[in-house]
Amino acid sequence: MVSDTIKYIGVDDLDIDLFESQYVVPEGMSYNSYLIDDEKIAVMDTADRRKGEVWKANLQAALNGRQPDYLVAHHMEPDHSALIAWMLESYPGLQLVCSAQAAKMLSNFFEGFNFEGRVLTVKEGDTLSLGKHELKFIGAAMVHWPEVMMSYDSLDKVLFSADGFGKFGALVNETDDWACEARRYYFNICGKYGIQVQNVLKKVAALDIQTICPLHGPVLKGEPLAAAIKLYDTWSKYEPESEGILIAYASIHGGTAVAAERLGEILRSKGAKKVVVSDLSRSDMAEVIEDAFRYPTVVVAASSYDGGVFPVMHDFLYHLQIKNYPKRRFGIIENGSWAPSAGKVMHSMIEGLKDCEIVEPMVTIRSRMKSADEAQLEQLAESLLS
């Protein structure tokens, strides 16, 4: 229960291995949905088709034989909208409430379904009275799709935040550390859209929000809610969350790995508060992206490959590019046995990032660390810490 009249009817998915076919979710996922029980009954979003039958059972138990009046679709992504057509077929008096942009998307997902007379489009500032509850709609375009909206219930002071404030993990596996998987979720799902997240945070700042009901992860209240809003403000401004240095390396036969690990040792010996060393070939890419946003400094170390850079490093830097990654300091280590090329490629990709600084010197090693290379790493460490 969210409140006496707002019920949780969502489902956990413990069978899923990759969320959006790319993010590992060892703790599963939740697809959150809520029912507001008033003079008019509103269902807030549906669920992923993967768990459709469980969701239907939860809905029907909450309805207890009654008919819902409204289905509010905050977000058209299929993990939340898959059962819209089933709802409209099952409850002939039901109206679908969504943004105009969402209404345009309906035929993309439900070919041939007749939505005529069944859709109520709403925009920024519109309200929907359910009786004692009144929903006010808030535009949240590109957080993280263009049709997204949020809604605010003025009675119970609840913000239904769509994918905002979501996290990886099923609710049955929830821990007290909300930030860990919320951070990985935010930077990989919404990381590109910091400006849009800031716009929404400014819109809701004047509201008395006592509860946040996201589409993934736990309902937030009290201190966890305040902490989540503070983190979202930091994250969406692209500010480092904490001091630290990420060393991300791409090594073929181990030589680059040795150099990366050695740089980490040198940095720690010189007083670096936090140094994280990640093997891009074996680490969860989403977690490395998370760390890149979390800390102010990143070192990329990679082997040369086919006249360019080892592919996993290219993939990492490409991920940063598409997330509009800004305002960080970079160090570069390249490795090449006969014609080092990795540094040039990495340098070029980093130059394409907004307001990012490349720290000198760029370190070049030949196949394996030599005693003479130690001085290069020492110099780079000094520059990174200065």
Q: Predicted regions span which residues?
A:
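Metallo-beta-lactamase
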Residues: 1-4, 98-148, 193-201
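Conserved beta-strand hairpin/beta-sheet module of binuclear metal-dependent hydrolase folds
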Residues: 2-60, 150-153, 157-161, 256
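Active-site neighborhood of phospho(di)ester-bond hydrolases with catalytic His/Asp-centered motifs
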Residues: 44-46, 68-76, 96-99, 159-163, ...
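Active-site metal-binding motif and surrounding structural segment of the metallo-beta-lactamase
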Residues: 50-97
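Short acidic active-site motifs
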Residues: 83, 283-288
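Active-site-proximal loop/helix segment associated with metal-binding centers of metalloenzymes
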Residues: 144, 148, 164-192, 235-241
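FMN-binding flavodoxin-like domain, especially the glycine-rich phosphate-binding loop
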Residues: 171-212, 216-219, 262-278, 288-386
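Terminal amphipathic helices with adjacent charged low-complexity linkers/tails
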Residues: 217-242
